[in-house]
Amino acid sequence: MSFHIERARPDQVDALCAIERAAVELFRGHPAWPSYREVSVPPEVMREAIARGLVWVAVIGSGEPVGFVWLDAEEGGDAIGVAEMDVLPSHGQRGIGAALLEHACGWARMAGYHRVDLGTLADVPWNAPFYAKHGFHAVDKNLPEFAFARERDRENGFPDDLRVFMSRPLTPSDPTDWTVWPAPAKVNLFLRIVGRRPDGYHELQTVFRLLDWGDEIRLRIRHDGEIHRLTDVPGVPAETDLVVRAARLLQPHAPAGSGVDIEVEKRVPMGGGLGGGSSDAATVLVALNGLWGAELGEDTLAELGRQLGADVPVFVRGRSAWAEGIGEKLTPLSLPERWYVVLDPHEHVPTGALFQAAELTRNAPPATISSFASGETVENAFAPVVRARHSRVAAALDWLDGFGRARLSGSGACVFLETDSVERAEAIAERCPTGFTAHVAKGEDVSSLHVALARFRGIDRNGK
């Protein structure tokens, strides 16, 4: 029987949850059964993990998923956990679990993690003994670094005396191996146009809120000076793609012969006002700055980013921020913990036409950080224009308005709603109308790109 491993898709959620329910039946009769049968993966939680690219699925020739592995990055720091790994009992003992585990550990290594952790039953052959065969060793579960795992076990009601924690150290990747980097999306919590400069650019005020969801950039260093984008991005020729332009812009600051292969996994809707292309470019700048040994300072990198687009500097600096000018004057902000329902209405909104719209308000009085913090400043200058010209965006705003105060991000087309809890965000997303696509994301003060950069900086690639 042949199978292959791929990133899980949202339309596979029900199949993966069914695999988990089938796999847990194998524990009937075990002392842990009473707690195991009470714990199952909610579909909305699985969907969120898939959206973050942390679930891989084993698929047989017919297209049927027969197993999956799910990594959990909530542990933080230089470790990532195996939240769940299951194989359909009818497809057990065929190497599927081993292949899924190796695939997940390989990705974690490329992402700069130092180890992979998990909790499992000590006496079940396909649990602790299986993981031991694949490089995991038992650890002292009372160590401070496993506090998160201990709390998760308590929440699930798992019996402490039957469970063992295990860890697998990951060797640093070779300098010419693929590395994996996040490119987070953003939303604009408000957007005001306060004037127009002599050069024709508009003076803006906005708040960029970074999200924990976005694209993935994969980089492999070359030493022949060549820069290649290996993945096809519909409608975006390689030579005009911001990721290629970013690499070329940084190249003169790197040692002679520095080159790179680039792969882009798009999750953020293109042209949605979520900063996907700008974030991709920033990730290439920040990652290659270290991988190539250019070691430019953040200010210099941000200036290079500004040459690519007004939104690139905020992603280079990696902090949610109050922005002015054309978006390049940034003041970092610490914002309340919030979750966002981001709705993609699947409609193209041409930004240039909006800036030329006669009805666009271009001379609003300047806002202040305090007026934003008090909730007085929430409008988006583009929203009235987009509502009038783009019926699907208007319908998306109207639908989200039924749950709170819906807002447009950037110049659209995506809209969003801020919520106080992930549970409320997921409940709203579950009701998404046909024809729209909903995403749930958490706001982050510090970019996942900078978290990844810290992990990579903690790795001595010469093994010292």
Model segments located where?
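Conserved glycine-rich acetyl-CoA-binding loop
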Residues: 64, 88-102, 111, 122-128, ...
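Conserved, helical-rich catalytic subdomain that frames metal- and/or nucleotide-binding sites
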Residues: 316-405, 418-464
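Acetyl-CoA-dependent GNAT
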Residues: 10-13, 17-90, 101-103, 107, ...
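C-terminal "cap" of GNAT-fold acetyltransferases
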Residues: 114, 121-128, 134-174
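ATP-binding N-lobe of GHMP and related small-molecule kinases
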Residues: 174-272, 290, 294-299, 326, ...
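Glycine/serine-rich anion-binding loops at beta->alpha junctions
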Residues: 263-292, 405-419
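Conserved acyl-CoA
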Residues: 99-115, 287-291
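Conserved N-terminal entry element of GNAT/NAT acetyltransferase domains
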Residues: 1-11, 164, 170-178
